Amino acid sequence: MISSNDLRPGVSVEIDGAPYKVIEFLHVKPGKGAAFVRTKLKNMQTGNVVEKTFRAGETLPAATIEKVEMQYLYAEGNNLVFMDMETYEQAPITAAQIGSAVKYLKENMQVSILRWNGQVIDVELPNTVVLEVVETDPGVKGDTATGGTKPAKLETGAEIQVPLFIKVGERIRVDTRTDTYLGRE
């Protein structure tokens, strides 16, 4: 059990039978009346964000989230097959369970799979990945002076904005959290 006074961003709690992660919290102590904690919580199964208020000292059950290091092997229909790095056990996970992280998955990439009650609720990718540009408009001499960007398609199918000087075949570093270009590799 976790006291509402101990809630901080990143803490996982269970509310109404679902796992939630605290995004924001504010301890409010009004001049009159009892103190309370105002929180913004993200449902880890659906991704919905809700605001909840708890009395100071109220206890909540902790959500036991299991983090497992796995390696992405291959796609098989709508399933993506991952291998547990400790037991070498293979586990198929649907693309819908992974969500938007699918666009950066590359074969043999190591990821962290988050499980709650044996059910996959999220995939944590590395913060940056190095991918090859497979499709983009050709650069024209003098493009770099303007500092503009153009769309580029990466080897995994993801599309991001890159500087005008990037060419097809170049390997670039991408931030998976913000979908932004970080630099050449």
Swiss-Prot record:
Main localization category: cytoplasm
Family label: Belongs to the elongation factor P family.
InterPro entries: Elong-fact-P_C, NA-bd_OB-fold, Rib_uL2_dom2, Transl_elong_fac_P/YeiP, Transl_elong_KOW-like, Transl_elong_P/YeiP_cen, Transl_elong_P/YeiP_CS, Transl_elongation_fac_P
Keyword annotations from UniProtKB, A to Z: Cytoplasm, Elongation factor, Protein biosynthesis
Name of the featured protein: Elongation factor P
NCBIfam families: efp, PRK00529.1
Localization annotation: Cytoplasm
GO cellular component, one term: cytoplasm
Pathway: Protein biosynthesis; polypeptide chain elongation
GO biological process: peptide biosynthetic process
PROSITE patterns on file: EFP
Biological role stated in the UniProt entry: Involved in peptide bond synthesis. Stimulates efficient translation and peptide-bond synthesis on native or reconstituted 70S ribosomes in vitro. Probably functions indirectly by altering the affinity of the ribosome for aminoacyl-tRNA, thus increasing their reactivity as acceptors for peptidyl transferase.
Gene Ontology molecular function: translation elongation factor activity
